[in-house]
UniProtKB/Swiss-Prot annotation:
Record's subcellular location: Secreted
InterPro entries: CEMIP_beta-hel_dom (IPR055401), G8_domain (IPR019316), G8_domain-comF-like (IPR052334)
Species for this entry: Dictyostelium discoideum (Social amoeba)
Assigned protein family: Belongs to the comF family.
Glycosylation sites: 308, 559, 736, 854, 968, 1035, 1056, 1070
Signal sequence bounds: 1-22
SMART domains in UniProt: G8
Name of the featured protein: G8 domain-containing protein DDB_G0288475
Lineage: Eukaryota, Amoebozoa, Evosea, Eumycetozoa, Dictyostelia
Keywords: Glycoprotein, Secreted, Signal
Cellular component terms per the entry's GO annotation: extracellular region
Domain of life: Eukaryota
Any Pfam family: G8
Tagged with keyword Repressor: no
Amino acid sequence: MKYSSFLLLFIYIFFILNNINAQSCPSTSSTWRPTMASFVTPTSPSIATIQPQLDFLLGKNNLVFMGQYGYSATSITDGPTGVANSFTMNYDTWGPAMHWLVVKTPVPALKANQNYEFSFGFKLGQVLGSYNKIASISVNFFNPADITDPNGGSQYFVTPAHPAVYSKTVTTGSWTSSTTFAQNIITLTPTVDIGLSIMAIQITRTSQTGPAITTMFVSNMKLSIPSRTVPAPPTNLITKDSELIAIPKPLSSLDAQDSTTCPYLATDLVHWHDPTIWTSGVVPLPSTSSNIIIPAGKKVLISPCSINQTGIYQKITIPATSELIFADASLTMNIQDIYVQGKFIMGTTKCRYNANINIVFNGAMTTVDTIAQYFGSKGIAVASGGFISVHGRQYHNTWTKLAATAWSGDNVIYIQDDVNWIVGQQVVVATSVYQDEKYPENEVMTIAAIQGKVIQFTEPLKYYHYGGQEYQAEVALLTRNIVFQSESSSAASSFGGHVLVSGEGQFAGIQLIRMGQRNIKGRYPLHFHMANTVSKSYISDCSVVSSYYRCYTIHATNNVTVTRNVAFDVNGHCYYLEDGVEMDNTLSFNFASYVHTIGTPAAGYNQYGQDFTQSSSLAQPADVAAGGFYITNAWNSFIGNAASGGWAGFSFPNLDAPIGNSINVPIVPKQFTTKVFQGNTAHSSGYFFEFGSSIYVGGDLSTGSDGLLVYNSGRISRETYLNGVESGGEIWMRFNNTKVYLSNRGIGMWGERVEVILLESHDSIRPGSLFGEAWLSDAIVNGQTGNLLSKTTDYSRQGFQFYDTYVKTILTNIIFRNFVHNPLSTSPEDDNRVIISMTHSDEFKPQFISATKNITIQGTAVSQYIGHRIFDTGSSRQFNFVDYDGTISGRSVPTIFGAHDKWWQFDNTCTYNNDWNSWVCNKGTYEVASVSVEVPGYMDRSGEYDATSNVGYIYLFGSGITDSRRMNVTRNVGITGISDFGWYLYWTVGTPSYIKLWLSEVPYGHYVFFAIPYPASTTFKVSCEYKYNSQHSYNFTQATSAAAVRSGDGKKYYFNGTHLFVKVINFVLNGSEYFSRGGAKINDVYWEFIVHITATNTVKPPVNGFYTGLTDVLPSSTL
């Protein structure tokens, strides 16, 4: 009896405690409402005139002990107990007299001629003696490329290749005490601005460490930027973010509001805290097991007093006829699952909420569907037919850009756009370094004061953020007043909450923190899932922060608008189009930053890249190449977005078929071109893979025979057609008004057709790598900007590298700027040249595949215009391009650039440029032609022979040429040279008895006049054929002279007893076979028009198919 009474009392107390909030609601009347939140912009303090000191702390966790020897993993250990920010240096016996403490993390940028302080406390572990006496301490700032990478795992300090950018050595200091920490301050005054650097402290003793282990203690080591007066505002604030292109921006006005439409004003609402609406007659309590079902046909209003704000509710189900409506009043709800079949309302399009509403998702990691079948656990799921509307206060713009460079130590920044941000909110200032993951310099800052476009932070910036005319670091608002987040303990499992919508959904003004469930498909922070074509769905001005898995996902859903959102610190692809069937969606004015791959980033040592297969630790294998925007189907609109960091900023993988839930949809996703790609920006990406880029059209994603996804990160061709079907006809993939900077290859396109119109590229290794029929026009390609962090020898700059075979590349209306000679370069390819040849291969050789027109080169020495590496390969010997107006050559007439061999010196207009390693000639009426000379079993297209497999030479002859103008020929087929000239082909092993000439590129109206040596008394059968029909098959007849052959119709040959003369013309052509853009033209490589030459000689028959012993004699110069 006593036990029963006690139990009843306990239940009563538990009920009272858990309903204390409900009991505080004054009324259950349908007319009662809590006081709704209102918003008055808080008054900001004035901008303070003093910026505080910035201390960059150095300790055990961000230092590496290095030396030539005498180091180990325990060379640095914890400091003495009770001494804050301290560490111990442990010296082994007979170690070297010198060692280094190298900083693992980026250090602040330092201005020339300003004073900085390096300080530390120091104490000897043993009494001062001959083996622990310090002679000097030196503080050094090195270019990262010059010393051992402190994050690379090695403690061996490589002797720097070059002197430190700045160094300060002191030989006196408080280094002798073994009883107390003595303070040391070293003043640093750099003589040059220091951008990206590695700080290394060299400690030198008077001798080796001796026979006994010694220790030294260091406390509170730091690099300090002293407090100073806030500088006067710059007079040259950026007002236009680009010089050439136009990056669109959202409307400046706030979304229209009408408070009379707010959902909490409806007269037919009932209160959550009204026990009479519940079938049990009791207001539901937080519980670890109960499913709270909203009464059918009811619109239930939640007020702060309605619920317990500390207990965890297990699950809420909203039936199809019901609605759950939140009041615009601040509250916190802890929940595991919410299942929406009806409506979930927390503000609307016309009634954004002002309250601070915090929804905290709780729950341990599981793959059990606790929300509903297929909808997972720990989050909100909206069923097909359901509706969700969540609208927080609008902060606009959600992101902007710097209007001036911000230095390390600054606590005031200037931005370009009007914003209505407020004191106390957090922003992220994006990085201005190339390798975002290696040197993490994104900074989350808190607003202390804001006056118009001037923002002051509570603390100084640690790093340098560039805001020059070329480009400017983004500044994005992270804070929102409605927050969906997971409990902080979820970080250990990366199992956060998720929001999944299979019906219609409208989201605006939400911050999502620690959301997503790592490697569980379909469990993303904000996710439209298999909703088909929607009519009123959008995600606007939200933020995703510290996501475990993605940001904003569109999965098998069309017609969604995703606009003005931001994301920061994200694992896996961020803005994510999942299966390849997603079309007609609009992603506009969004920002993604600091996006991390899952697992080791995809790399590889050649164009193939690497292969990855789906696994429990990599549910989507393409996440090894995670980027800001992942686009499995290009037929969507991308307008005014920006991506900072990631493997790529924008990634277009190739899908031969949809994947996942959409695997049976009968389309080929990779055949769709971009619907709209306008005004997008990407930077600080593309560097994990040699062939990576910030906008990457490449890689392949498919479903294997075992049902697992397979991803290849490398070169995959992409054909694009109108409406995504081959019968629709070929169409070019187009990128308009694009900016790339601090990038590897800017825009990387492995496909067959691409147009890049209006491009700015700054501080990138290359502006792009464009394959197929490619046109780059109206661009600025800037090798070096004013960004201090980009002034490094870590990577070279190339204006554009022409490919080596079977493409067509046209560059028009381009300004190349600031390609400055690198005195440390070892070849033209790393010497910051404007036009670069590709010379590594003998198997792949260029035809006429590259052309330019209207090129302007600024801030660049003429010697830097062309970078051609002389290499013993066909691709080096046959490098060529046409400068259609002579703006590169400076001749003001169409010009042919040819490689280093005299083979390219075809007339008296040709001059050799030693800086360029190239011949430069007036084009005149000539074209560049290419012929594949094949000898079955010896020289054929299927062979892959060594570059040194020389078989002879090709010479120019006739036209008054008397000297030797030749080029090596190897067993790898393909000879490119000048049309309408004599080509004399000599084999050192003897002339083959059968030769097949594929006229791969002999343009319409032009020819090649061949001369080939044979022994006397040889007879010939010469014919031509087109593989695909017999209309142009001819048997050649013998002419009366070589001159008659050259002036003839291309169906004759002549043998003068030493040389066979054959004029080859492609009879299939009609003059339409070319790719033309911007006033430049490249002729097609035309497949399989063949000339056959069969030689017979009974007097001196061939030996193993070759006529040997022939003299190498140039034909007459008068021909």
